[in-house]
């Protein structure tokens, strides 16, 4: 049986971990690794003597892709893939998305899952022209507790994305994906929406639950948070919720 030839688009912690996994177990099938910038993934590819380059623009990408390959994978990739690129892959592209699709398509799913109290998890889906809309082939749900915030959900999604991909990838290679889930409805969010949602209006009334959810959704160590302004000053607000044992 001919081994399928693969192109990887990889970024971030998840991309690095999965590139290491693929190079360890499937190195002879990887034709090319594309990175979003010069980073550790680039170094790993170079050390493994795998062709690699940094994404510049779509024209550069198209001209530097192999003329034909079997499968493409987006591993924590931050950019949309154009139709012309999708059509080069014989069996299409698969994307790893940190939400329980069809909920929270687009940006910042860890924020919206808490803010809107939607189901959360990670998904692998076929890539179509529209963002995060292709058929879902694998999912893992992640429960949300009151102690969670945007940062903790992000970390949980990284771990589960890695686990789900390692479990699902061999099935894709062997054409053993026999069932898909329709990816319609749900919700979609643009990059700017989270920032517009993050201002606290001091004159507005909030239900306590809604305010807690908004504050913890935007709480992420080392990142900007919800904020309010007063007398020309701007203040950031974070929240920490701890579960305590009740003695009966």
Which residues fall in each region the model found?
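One-carbon transfer enzymes
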Residues: 1-248
């Amino acid at each position: 049986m001919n081994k399928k030839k693969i192109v990887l688009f990889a970024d971030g912690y998840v991309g690095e971990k999965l590139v290491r996994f693929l190079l360890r177990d499937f190195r002879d099938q990887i034709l090319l690794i594309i990175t979003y910038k010069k980073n550790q993934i680039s170094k790993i590819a170079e050390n493994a003597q795998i062709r690699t380059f940094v994404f510049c623009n779509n024209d550069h990408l198209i001209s530097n892709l192999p003329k034909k390959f079997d499968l493409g994978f987006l591993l924590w990739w931050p950019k949309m893939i154009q139709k012309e690129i999708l059509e080069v892959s014989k069996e299409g592209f698969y994307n790893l998305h940190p939400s329980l699709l069809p909920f929270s398509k687009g940006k910042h799913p860890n924020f919206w899952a808490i803010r809107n109290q939607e189901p959360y998890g990670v998904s692998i889906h076929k890539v179509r022209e529209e963002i995060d809309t292709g058929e879902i082939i694998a999912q893992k749900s992640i429960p949300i507790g009151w102690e969670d915030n945007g940062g903790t959900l992000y970390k949980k999604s990284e771990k589960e994305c890695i686990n789900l991909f390692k479990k699902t990838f061999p099935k894709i290679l062997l054409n053993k994906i026999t069932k898909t889930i329709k990816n319609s409805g749900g919700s979609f969010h643009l990059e700017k929406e989270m920032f517009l949602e993050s201002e606290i209006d001091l004159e507005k009334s909030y239900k306590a639950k809604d305010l807690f959810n908004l504050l913890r959704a935007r709480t992420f160590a080392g990142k900007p948070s919800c904020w309010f302004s007063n007398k020309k000053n701007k203040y950031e607000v974070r929240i920490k919720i701890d579960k305590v044992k009740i003695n009966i």
